[in-house]
């Protein structure tokens, strides 16, 4: 039996921490880190110009939806800081969603609007939403880095309070006057 997969391309700071968390998310089949969103061909760690460090995620849409993947993405990095995650600063560490089709674009924009309206995050989302372009796979030493170096650097963690209420819950919250 062949599993149907979808592809997501996300950037949220250093790709090591993003990959370590996303690879374990239910429905994720494979991940690889690389560079995208810039103008340098054949990007490498030493020469990636204005590309973002990104992660390509292949997932089973019968197990997890693109929306669920994005909600988790927004929990594991700070989408309210421009060109920065933790101590890492610069365009390489920007928050971005690189959509592969118009449906992904719509879902990304809708999710960002709901996050901004929720008031749960410390500021407004600055995540770029851009069409996916070439993805340059990072060098082998960057793939699954935190699997090989468990105490290696990361600034990514799950923020339990940064979770959007389910849509039906959101209506109940508004009706209950909690917001």
From Swiss-Prot:
EC code(s) of this entry: 1.8.4.11
Q: What are the UniProt keywords, alphabetically?
A: Oxidoreductase
| GO terms, molecular function | L-methionine:thioredoxin-disulfide S-oxidoreductase activity; peptide-methionine (S)-S-oxide reductase activity
Disulfide feature? none
Any idea which residues are catalytic in this one?
A: 14
Q: List the catalytic activities from the record.
A: L-methionyl-[protein] + [thioredoxin]-disulfide + H2O = L-methionyl-(S)-S-oxide-[protein] + [thioredoxin]-dithiol; [thioredoxin]-disulfide + L-methionine + H2O = L-methionine (S)-S-oxide + [thioredoxin]-dithiol
User: What is the uppermost EC class here?
Assistant: oxidoreductase
Q: Name one GO biological process term.
A: protein modification process
| InterPro entries in UniProt | Met_Sox_Rdtase_MsrA_dom, Met_Sox_Rdtase_MsrA_sf
Per the entry, what this protein does is: Has an important function as a repair enzyme for proteins that have been inactivated by oxidation. Catalyzes the reversible oxidation-reduction of methionine sulfoxide in proteins to methionine.
Q: Which NCBIfam families would you find in this protein's record?
A: msrA
What family, per the record? Belongs to the MsrA Met sulfoxide reductase family.
Q: What is this protein's record name?
A: Peptide methionine sulfoxide reductase MsrA
Q: Which organism is it from?
A: Nitrobacter winogradskyi (strain ATCC 25391 / DSM 10237 / CIP 104748 / NCIMB 11846 / Nb-255)
Q: From the UniProt record, report the name of the gene that encodes this protein.
A: msrA
């Amino acid at each position: 039996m062949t599993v149907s997969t979808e592809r997501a391309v996300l950037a949220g700071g250093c790709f090591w921490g993003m990959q370590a968390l996303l690879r374990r998310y239910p429905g994720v089949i494979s991940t690889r880190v690389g560079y995208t969103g810039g103008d340098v061909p054949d990007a490498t760690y030493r020469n990636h110009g204005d590309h973002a460090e990104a992660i390509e995620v292949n997932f089973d849409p019968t197990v997890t939806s693109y929306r669920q993947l994005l909600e988790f993405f927004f929990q594991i990095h700070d989408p309210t800081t421009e060109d920065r995650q933790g101590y890492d600063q610069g365009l390489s560490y920007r928050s971005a969603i690189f959509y592969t089709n118009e449906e992904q674009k719509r879902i990304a924009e809708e999710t960002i609007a709901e996050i901004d309206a929720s008031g749960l995050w410390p500021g407004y989302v600055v995540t770029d939403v851009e069409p996916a372009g070439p993805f340059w796979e990072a060098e082998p030493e960057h793939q699954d880095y935190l699997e090989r170096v468990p105490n290696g650097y990361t600034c990514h963690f799950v923020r339990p309070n940064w979770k959007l209420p389910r849509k039906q819950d959101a209506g109940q919250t508004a009706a209950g006057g909690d917001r």
